Amino acid sequence: MTAGILCSGLGMAGGPVMRVETGAARAEITALSWDTEGTGREKSNLLRPETAAGLRFRVGGHWHTGAELPTRVETNAAGARTYRITVTPEAEIVWHIESAKGNLALQFSGKGTALGSIETVELSLPFAPGVTPVTALSGDWSAEGTFRLPAIVSAPDFGQMLLTAKSTAAGRQAVHKAGLDGSRAQKFATMVLELAPPQAGVLDTLEFTPHFLPAPAGMVDTALWAQARRGWFNIWQPSARWGDQGNPYSAPAGMLGNNVISDPASCSLWFYADQAFWTPEIAPGISMLPLVRRTIEFWLSGSRLKPSGEVVCYWDFLNFLDANAGPLIASWDYVEASGDLAWLGRNIGKLELVADFLARRDVDGDGLVEATQSGNYGTLQQPARSCAWWDALNCGHKDAYCNAVIYRAWRCLADLEQKLGRGEQKKRYTQLADKLKAAYVPTLLNPETGWLAWWKSADGQLHDYAAPTVNGLAIEYGLVPQERGREILARLRAKMEAVGFTRFDLGVPPMLVPVPRADYIQPHGCGCPKQEDGADTFGQYMNAGITAGHVLHFLAAHYAVGEPGPADKILRAMLERQGRGEFQNGVTDSYPNGIDWTTWDGQPSGYEGYLADSFRFLQAVLLREARFRDRLYRPLAGER
């Protein structure tokens, strides 16, 4: 008997392909992969090396692995394989595996007088995050971190499979629950499905069906959607349960985060929520909104929300201003998309607590929110972090990135207050946003360069690194008048040309000149220069390395000011690269081997390898069109 190999597709170029390899004598799947767009990626096994997908049975309180039990193997003419597993002398489980037209069907039935002795049946799928971080997207998560079907099994850049279950017995739930268990240290993420115990005369079936996300309703120019639809899912990476749950360096199951075995971070929550806002229902019966809500509630509970209203960013790190802004924007995304005013009413007090913490951080009363970090040269020393997602930069005090995000957060909260008919509260957050906007450009515009500096430190210095990201964000959100915004964008494009940057398939660097050592985390942070001028690590990690997600704001700024041409040129180049799966190289957790950041010539300069945040640039496919911009920026309307 030889190993069984099933490879099925639709028989058309670019169509979905499923690859399954089964054990010759043991009841197991040794290789499992797919490619929904027919680009050949199914050749890479999604399962961990030297492991296999298979069954476990609990009998009399003891677990038995199906691959180790006596098994008869049958293969039909089409290559489908059937395993007849003797669990006890009087109980046999029949597992049938077949694939056709890019689908996979796993069928389970039982025979024998002692089927009732089988207490639990589990199907284990040991995925390899180092290949790509496979995870599950379900609209039904329990408080304990399990989920129910239907679900999308999302293999980034391989594609998505709709996982459903059915039974020949009326009312029978073929899969009781499912879960994700992983290890960051050992680099695994295992999906475990608890199947219904076998019942005589009943056939249960699990089906994996290639799934394609339709273009969002109202999209006029759908030509680019085919290039975006598979990667669109890449931003959603519900975590496996990994690490000691009593230690901040861990994650519970089912929280949106960096990747399936990495950290959730409150400063990034709005990235994932914005994308869910556009496509809340990702498949029939599967909404992303409960997962967004679950992650918001995670950050607004327990030790992660301090009595002061400050929100932890990740692990146990505080002093991140965007850690507070993230859940506020995400809450607007959730309520605006779901209409769940009951949830909003129950949580408005916490949202105000979070927002008011930010308001109190305007320590000098000028309207801008000041970070606790001074931002003065040479002050960011490990283990401390900066005030923002850009945690290896020395950004602090009056930070342009954080204040732009806070501006949107306050506008969003004002809109939420209006939904509840809370006029005075709406007025308060509107006034806070108005005051911030009035101070923003006068404080942060560098008259010598004609664009915004990244931050103004406590000693009064402007820290200006020719930043497309920060300037783009401010222009996109209307903090900069449109005419000046066009001038700034033109200056930055000219600067890009002057410094010789041409690799638009990678995106756009977050800054165009080196960050000196004194404005970088010290003494040994990733990308930290040894030279005082920063030239030795220029283009690496947060010293002007490129990460795709934040390119969104530079693109969106062009669309917002009515100059789509330069943005479309960059976006189309990035989409070509995305189609090849080149914005990630699997989970590496090793600096500088992760391609979540690249140098200007495309070499890896990150550590995650896979960073969900990277894929938010795909929202530019929608923000090219005014109707989508109007929806997202509605809380900013009249203030732009």
Set out the residue ranges of the language-model regions.
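Extended, loop-rich substrate-binding clefts of extracytoplasmic carbohydrate-active enzymes
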Residues: R58-L115, A174-M191
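Active-site acid/base region of carbohydrate-active enzymes
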Residues: A223-G246, W270-Y272, I282-W299, R304-K306, ...
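Acidic-aromatic substrate-binding/catalytic surfaces of carbohydrate-active enzymes
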Residues: G15-R84, G130, S138, E144
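Beta-strand-rich recognition/accessory modules
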Residues: S124-P126, V153-T222
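Bacterial N-terminal signal peptides
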Residues: M1-S8
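Active-site core of glycosidic bond-cleaving carbohydrate-active enzymes
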Residues: Y272-F277, P290, G349, D356, ...
